[in-house]
Amino acid sequence: MPRILPVPLGTANTYIVSEGPASILIDAGFPRQGRKFFTTLSKQGMDPARISLIVITHVHYDHVGNLREIRDACRCPVAVPAGEADWLRRGAVVFPAGVHPVGRALIGAGRLLSRVLPGFVRF
């Protein structure tokens, strides 16, 4: 059974879904909250090195603000909805290299995410 760990960041939340040694981070919160994110993880006993994938549910400011800092620290790929990946690649939002559109490989994860974040995840 997956473990769901909320990572509260004030008015924005992120979540870590873990099963076995792998963990997926759902969303990255507001900008300039990287230190708070890593401090909160540490207090909850979570090693950020366990994060193997970051999934962005949608590219609103409060969901991608810390993405670069978290991704650089975790050194993992980022998945975004396919319909928003091209928009990001055109430079509308500064986004780290390694962003990949969400594809069929994540459909199973999408089913799990739709239970964790109902109303936001659409695959």
Q: Which ranges hold each PLM region?
A:
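Active-site-proximal flexible loops/turns
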Residues: 15, 34, 65, 88-91
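Short, low-complexity, polar/charged sequence segments that are solvent-exposed and flexible
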Residues: 24-27, 43-46, 75, 97-100
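Conserved beta-strand hairpin/beta-sheet module of binuclear metal-dependent hydrolase folds
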Residues: 1-44
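Glycine-centered loop/turn positions within well-structured domains
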Residues: 15, 24, 62, 85-86
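Metallo-beta-lactamase
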Residues: 85-123
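Active-site metal-binding motif and surrounding structural segment of the metallo-beta-lactamase
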Residues: 35-80, 84
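Short, acidic/turn-prone active-site loops that include or flank metal/cofactor-
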Residues: 30, 83-86
